[in-house]
Amino acid sequence: KNGHENPWNLDFFGVGNENWECGGNMIPDFYANESRRYQTYVRNYHPDHPIHKVCCGANVDDYEWTSEVLKTTHNHCLKELHGNMDGLSLHYYVHPEGWEIKGSATDFDDKVWYKSLNKALFMETLIERHGHIMDEYDPEKKIGMIVDEWGAWYTVEPGTNPGFLYQQNTMRDALIAGITLNIF
C-alpha cells in the first residue's frame, strides 16, 4: 500500500524548499542544522547512481542566507564532505512591477517590456555574488549552484484559480528565458 517496491533512482534530492519562507519560516542556522540532520537519511543505494543532495539556498539576493547556511553546514563537518551537500539552490523570478503587484502577463507597455528584460539580466549578478560566497567555503567548487526556480512571475490571470498560478506566456517570456539560459 505504501512505499515503492524498487528504488526510484533519483538523481537529485532537495533537503527542503524555500525554508526561508513557506517551507518553514526558518532562520539560516536553524535550517542549516535541519539540513545537516535530514541529509543523513539521503543515502546512495547504488555506487553507479549517486544521489546529489541539494541544500536550500537563498531567495534572490539574500546573501546572508547563503553565507550563514554554508557557515553552519561546514561547521563540525569534515572538509572533504563539503558541508554534506552537492548543491545549493537559488530562486529568482522576474516581477516587472515588484512582488506585491507583479504586473500583467499580456497587458504591458514598452517600458515594462524593457524593465522585464533588464531584470532578467540580474541573474548574472546573483550567480556571481552567491558564487563568491560559495567559494569562501568551497574553494574546490565541489558544491554546484542549482538555480531550480526561475523565470517570470506575473499577477494571476483574471478568472483563473489563484492557487494554480496560471499565466499566459508571450514573446517577452521567451526572451527572459533566452537571456537567463544564456547566462547559465
Annotate each PLM feature.
Residues 1-109, 128:
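N-terminal catalytic cores of secreted or lumenal carbohydrate-active enzymes
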Residues 61, 72-83, 87, 110-184:
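Catalytic-core region of carbohydrate-active enzymes that cleave or remodel glycosidic bonds
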